[in-house]
Regions:
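Short cytoplasmic-facing helical segments at TM-TM junctions of multi-pass membrane proteins
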Residues: 109-112, 164-168
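Membrane-embedded alpha-helical bundles of polytopic integral membrane proteins
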Residues: 1-113, 119-149
């Protein structure tokens, strides 16, 4: 068991050394791994979160979020703005299309108000945003559409996961 634990602790060290990770990237990488393990653990276990655990979890996870926002702000303000606008457009599209056309519930046990039509509206509005943006920036349309698609997917998934945590 000691050899397995030692090996498991050595792997990230080698990875960070080989890829020249600095402190910010270590925070990002660690939080990504933590989120992935926590999400899988939480979804497949019968573990219920207590209020104290929620406070600790929120405190741990707010640091990487803040570091990433500050890092993006310092490196590329327009990219950070693009991310926020894309998230806002996804939320607005989901709300408007869901209210107007929403008939099929996405996950009624997790978030009763979210509909498949709302999600499609989020993707549709963000695709229009990507096409409009491609006229003003020197980035290929396919890359912008891929970016807004990824952001929309993560936005919807994040909303659903947050609703799941809220319901417990």
């Amino acid at each position: 068991q000691k050899i397995i634990l030692w090996s498991a602790s050595l792997v990230p060290s080698i990875y960070f050394y080989l890829f020249n990770f600095d402190n910010i990237n270590i925070i990002f990488f660690t939080s990504l791994i933590f989120w992935l393990f926590f999400a899988v653990f939480h979804l497949y276990s019968k573990f219920h979160l207590t209020n104290n655990f929620n406070v600790i979890l929120g405190t741990i996870l707010i640091v990487p979020l803040w570091v990433s926002v500050v890092s993006l702000f310092l490196d590329n303000k327009l990219f950070l703005l693009f991310i926020f606008i894309s998230i806002f457009i996804a939320d607005i599209g989901a709300y408007l299309f869901g209210k107007k056309y929403g008939k099929n519930k996405l996950m009624p046990n997790v978030s009763p108000g979210k509909t498949v039509e709302g999600v499609l509206g989020a993707f549709f509005l963000n695709t229009i945003f990507a096409c409009s943006l491609s006229f003003y920036v020197s980035v290929e349309l396919l890359i912008i559409v891929a970016g807004t698609t990824l952001i929309t997917f993560l936005s919807v998934f994040g909303d659903l996961y947050e609703s799941l945590l809220k319901r417990q």
